[in-house]
Amino acid sequence: MTDQEQQQLTAAGNEMSASFLAAKKRSDATLAKLEAEPGKFTMLTGDRPTGRLHLGHYFGSIKERVAMQNRGVNTNIIIADYQVITDRDTTEHIQDNVLNLVLDYMAAGIDPTKTMMFTHSAVPAENQLLLPFLSLVTEAELHRNPTVKSEMEASGHALTGLLLTYPVHQACDILFC
């Protein structure tokens, strides 16, 4: 750690930790590389089609997705229609929600000529990766996942085993893109 970083760390009222400063330094370096050569980067993001998007979605992530797309970053957006059934009682509105999600993305500035948008259900090969991936993790590991644990606690009702596969499905998403 440099003297300047140490002074920043110990300055009165400064609550940043050394690990935060190191992470910020790495983030700043990555951002500089992104600005210089955006085409060397790939962004993978997505949403579950559970309803219409709102301002929170826009300011929380979609605005930045549009900016990254317009910088020239290879942009992939998953519409995680299979993941909706992990914690929902019905699949009745999924098709309408997928269509509305795409329309909302486009209205917010996502350009389908610059960004690949796809649903899980449209890519059988991605879902076929799920079985061999599941053979690499134990049931106990799936139950220890903090996101899965909080979803189970928050649901208030019994959930299907599909929720346990959610993080493994996300690993398949990453390999696909």
Model-derived segments and spans:
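NTP-dependent nucleotidyl-transfer catalytic core
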Residues: M1-C177
